[in-house]
Amino acid sequence: MQVLNSLRNAKQRHPDCQIVKRKGRLYVICKTNPRFKAVQGRKKRR
């Protein structure tokens, strides 16, 4: 899953991509091609 500042381009990568809001964060989910998953505004783990 990618951590992005903006999901503007992430939602246009595949026609089946959807934006979902969960627990105050925005997620892009794509059931047909899961490599396009993304989240906005979460710190990366090191």
Swiss-Prot record:
Q: Which domain of life is it from?
A: Bacteria
User: Which cellular component, as a GO term, is one annotated location?
Assistant: ribosome
Q: Which GO terms describe its molecular function?
A: structural constituent of ribosome
A Gene Ontology annotation in the biological process aspect, one of them, is: translation
Which chain regions cross the lipid bilayer?
A: none
Similarity-based family: Belongs to the bacterial ribosomal protein bL36 family.
Tell me yes or no: is Metal-binding among this UniProt entry's keywords. Answer: no
Instruction: Name the PANTHER family for this protein.
Output: 50S RIBOSOMAL PROTEIN L36 2, LARGE RIBOSOMAL SUBUNIT PROTEIN BL36B
- Give the matching Pfam families: Ribosomal_L36 (PF00444)
KW Ion transport (keyword) present: no
Task: Name the species this protein comes from.
Answer: Salmonella typhimurium (strain LT2 / SGSC1412 / ATCC 700720)
User: What keywords were assigned to this record?
Assistant: Ribonucleoprotein, Ribosomal protein
Q: Mind telling me what this protein is named?
A: Large ribosomal subunit protein bL36B
